[in-house]
């Protein structure tokens, strides 16, 4: 009966990881592309013998319109949170639009075993479970960036946000709680400025 709820995306990722010829795996998504031809070198260049995870950033370009500005702002805040947290030795998530980890690490943590029944979480929940301050590195250089295609419909963006929110309650540690508190305080600050 549990097989009914198995995420096809996670199954596809698992089969891909199993079939991979080399230990270092690098991921992006179909709606993203590297900004230049040095992306592979930049991301893989972050590995040392101790490194098992490399986190990168995927930008959302400066498209015209309020909706695109909102998405770009949200994407920037999310990136700042997870990358700065990892840089301060508290990694808690990654983003599948620009992410690398070792095949060995994937199987050491039994892949997506902890979240097979969830449709989302192939990137954030796995990194949340497997990352440590010792095994995680951030690469943020012009060569390491990817870029997401423009999102044209509110429903698509909302689905992405709901999907991410559905996995947040499974995060270990209290890093995400801190960032939720920070977001709430920022919202209250803006509301108080507007009210004055």
Regions found by a protein language model. Name each.
Residues 29-45:
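Acidic donor-binding/catalytic loop of UDP-sugar-dependent glycosyltransferases
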């Amino acid at each position: 009966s549990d097989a009914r709820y198995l995420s096809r995306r996670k199954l596809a990722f698992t089969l891909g990881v199993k079939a991979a010829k080399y230990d270092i795996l690098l991921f992006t998504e179909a709606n993203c592309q590297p900004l230049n031809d040095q992306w592979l070198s930049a991301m893989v260049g972050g590995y040392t013998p101790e490194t098992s995870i490399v986190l990168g950033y995927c930008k959302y370009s400066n498209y015209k319109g309020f909706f695109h500005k909102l998405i770009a702002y949200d994407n920037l805040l999310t990136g700042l949170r997870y990358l700065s947290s990892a840089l301060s030795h508290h990694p808690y998530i990654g983003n599948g639009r620009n992410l690398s980890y070792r095949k060995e690490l994937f199987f050491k943590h039994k892949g997506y075993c902890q979240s097979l029944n969830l449709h989302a979480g192939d990137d954030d929940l796995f990194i949340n479970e497997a990352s440590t301050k010792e095994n995680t590195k951030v690469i943020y250089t012009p060569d390491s960036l990817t870029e997401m295609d423009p999102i044209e419909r509110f429903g698509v963006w909302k689905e992405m946000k709901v999907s991410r929110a559905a996995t947040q309650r499974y995060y270990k540690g209290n890093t995400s709680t801190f960032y939720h508190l920070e977001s709430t305080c920022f919202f209250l600050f803006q509301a108080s400025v507007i009210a004055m």
